[in-house]
Amino acid sequence: LENVMMAQYYHSMVDKEEALQALESVGLKDRHNHLPNQLSGGEQQRVCIARALINHPSLILADEPTGNLDEKNEMLVLDILERLHNSGSTIVVVTHDQEVGVEAERIVFLEHGRIAREEKQKRQRPVLEV
C-alpha cells in the first residue's frame, strides 16, 4: 500500500482510501499488506500501474509493461491498460513483443531511430475482468 502511495508522500497528500482503490482497480486490494518480495512478477507490475494511477494521468508511457510476465499476467496488464484507455487516458506502449503490439489501435515501427511506417488496426480480443 505504501508503495502505491509514494507519489502522495512527495506531495503531502496521503490518501489511503485512494491508494486502496488504485490497488482494487488492478485486482490487488486483498494484497495491500504484502511486501514487494511477497508478490509475483505480475503482481509487482500491477502495483507499478496502481502507483501511476494514483496521479490520475491523462497520458501513460508504458515501457515494456509485459516484459518477463507469464501469459495470464500479460493479459491482465493489457486489460488494465485497455480499461485506462477506455476511460480517457492516452496509452503509449513501447515494446519489442509483436504479440503486445497487435493490441494497439496504432503501431509505429522504428528503424534506426526513425519512423519506418505506421499502421492502424482494430482490437480483436475481448477484455478480461480483473
Predicted feature residues:
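Conserved ABC ATPase "signature" region
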Residues: 5, 14-31
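Conserved ABC ATPase signature
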Residues: 35-45
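Hydrophobic anchor residue at the start of the ABC signature
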Residues: 49
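Conserved catalytic motifs of ABC-family nucleotide-binding domains
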Residues: 56
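Catalytic Walker B motif of ABC-type/P-loop ATPase nucleotide-binding domains
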Residues: 60-63
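Helix N-cap at the start of a conserved alpha-helix in ABC-type nucleotide-binding domains
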Residues: 71-73
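Conserved catalytic loops of ABC-family nucleotide-binding domains
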Residues: 80-93
